[in-house]
Amino acid sequence: MDEAFGDSLSTDYRWLGHSHFDSHPSAGDSIYFDSLDEDADPSRTARIDRIAELLDGLNDEQISELVNGVNSTTIKENTKKEISNPNDSTRLPLEQIPGSNNLFLDPRHQLGDNSQNAQRHHEPSFNSEKASYTSTPYKNVAPKVIDSPSARHMHSNSPSFPPSQSHTSSYDQSPKGQLRDNISVPNQQDGLDPEVFNQQSKETKKSLQVPPSRNVPPPVTRPNQYNPEPNFSLSSGYPQQHFSQPELQNRNVHLETVPESYPVPPSGYPLTSSTCVSSISQPIQSTDCQKAQENLSNNKQMSSNDQDIDPFKQAITDLPPSFVNIVLEMNATIQSLSNQCQQRDKQIENITKQLLMNQQDYCPTTMSTTVSTPLCPPKRFPKSTKDFKEQKPDTKQVRSATISNDFNLKGNGRYNEKSQIAVPSEIRVQLSTLDAILLQFEHLRKELTQARKEIQILRHTSQNGDQESNESSKNAITTKTTDKGNNKENTMLNDGSTAPAKNDIRNVINTNNLDAKLSDESELMIEKNKSYSTPASSTIPTFHTSQPLTSLNMPDSRFNLAKEKQLYYRLGLQHIDQQCSVETANMLKTVLVQLNIPFAIFPSTIGQVRRQLQQGRRLYQWARNIHYLIYEENMRDGLVSKQCLADMLKKIRELKKRSL
């Protein structure tokens, strides 16, 4: 076994941190995504110089974040389609894209020599696409894939990917590290000129830059709020990783609202992968949203002083108008519900006060009965009584009871039939004890009725038995009287002795019959109890009787054996007696399985097994003797091997030939 796997163990270098599959061209170890012909591009070198300057101003933590982001979402673009369409108008140069100060990094220049080995086994190799990257403070780098009409058609027809609407935020490489929104760039096919749109986007970015205020806290943002579907990368089937966001607490995050001059794309505008929108980007606005945004802009101008007092209002107005409308509607509904709850609480308090006053004044002793039956309320005092308004409930004796919200007081002074009263704890305890007593009475009543039925049955049976006994006694008496002679009767009458009365005879017979029936019933009850106490026939074990062991019928009886008591302890039979029946049964099952003997024939075959064991012991002793005679040395202890027996047989044949 070790020799068979020795080669694989010796050539497996993965234990040393290096894989022997790295040299294979299909192992994904290449990080050069672009062709080498593009290295001489002057715009490319300018971008590399700009990236180097930006990287010099970053900290070690920011550089590690960028490296982790690139390692997690590496994607490339179809280079063949790019070569076939070099003059594609949808590809904008870096200087024309809004927010061009973002980092579009090349993995070859971003990663050093030390990080190449770490990236080999984490990233698959793609031979048809090129990707550029944007850094974010969320540690979630979304690729900005350059689109083409064929690529958009390919992604629109792909059934395995959701609509490619990325929600990632670009990171401004300023000292404060502010968060900005990348305004989505529409395609030229939608009727907007890229140059005009870029000019408008530059103007809007200048107008939207707001200086950071120290008093205003960063608003709470929810990533992917308007995209319920998960974000999937376009070239790989793996979803993007969402890491924690600890840096947002130490940075001033500013949200930019879209002004009225911002060109709204048409309703059928397809969202491509090149539109890098922030995690709280503005959705496509309708006419209602524009009206709400105008109202918000007016409210901003009117409530400038209020924002200095309450900093959270500014954060709410910076949110999208649809979200602001939802928040305002929720606030209005919450306020209305709170007002309704307050009014309902006041009504409940008034009703409870009136109810407690009436119950305490009119029937304080029957509180439990009135509360337990809310459908039959007590009578109220007439409205003309003066004590009705003056008296108040005693808080020490009666606790405040709460009534359900459906309880309404009618004008005629009566309760609503559907009203339900929450009973105080003391009254609940009393009711629970009363219920327990009632249940006990009910149980006793059932037992009493059952006993009465049994008594009636016994009476009926006793009456039937009395009738039968009376008839039999009558027949016996008549037969006896007929057998006697008339002379005896005459002598008895003449002597003046009176015959026993018939009623006395019947009473004696009835008592005897009752005693006999009671004895029969007692015997039946005893038999029933025995049947219940004795186990079922299926659970009773079958007892096997065998002949006792003696010195004559024991195995190897030709030898002088010890006494039965010594044999008992020599064989360890006391351990079997100490075991329970389950353990003994398991041992017997194991023996039957090892010997391959059914239980039905086990008593008859146990002698045969004994003889086979005895014969095997004799043959073993004979083999040991032959071995000593041939080789003049003792055989090793244990089972005799086939090879040893064959050698012994061969040696015996040789000796026989020599003797002949």
UniProtKB/Swiss-Prot annotation:
GO biological process, one term: cell division
Molecular function per GO: signaling adaptor activity
Keyword Cytoplasm: yes
Keywords recorded for this protein, A-Z: Cell cycle, Cell division, Cytoplasm, Cytoskeleton, Mitosis
Top-level lineage group: Eukaryota
Pfam families: SID
Localisation per UniProt entry: Cytoplasm, Cytoskeleton, Microtubule organizing center, Spindle pole body
InterPro entries named in the record: Sid4-like (IPR021750)
Positions with biased composition (Polar residues): 125-138, 156-176, 222-243, 459-480, 488-497
Any one Gene Ontology cellular component term annotated for this protein: meiotic spindle pole
Cell cycle as UniProt keyword: yes
Region annotated Disordered, chain positions: 79-243, 368-396, 459-503
Compositional bias ranges of the Basic and acidic residues kind: 384-396
Assembly information from the UniProt record: Homodimer. Interacts with cdc11, sad1, plo1 and dma1.
Its job: Required for activation of the spg1 GTPase signaling cascade which leads to the initiation of septation and the subsequent termination of mitosis. May act as a scaffold at the spindle pole body to which other components of the spg1 signaling cascade attach.
Protein name: Septation initiation protein sid4
Native source species: Schizosaccharomyces pombe (strain 972 / ATCC 24843)
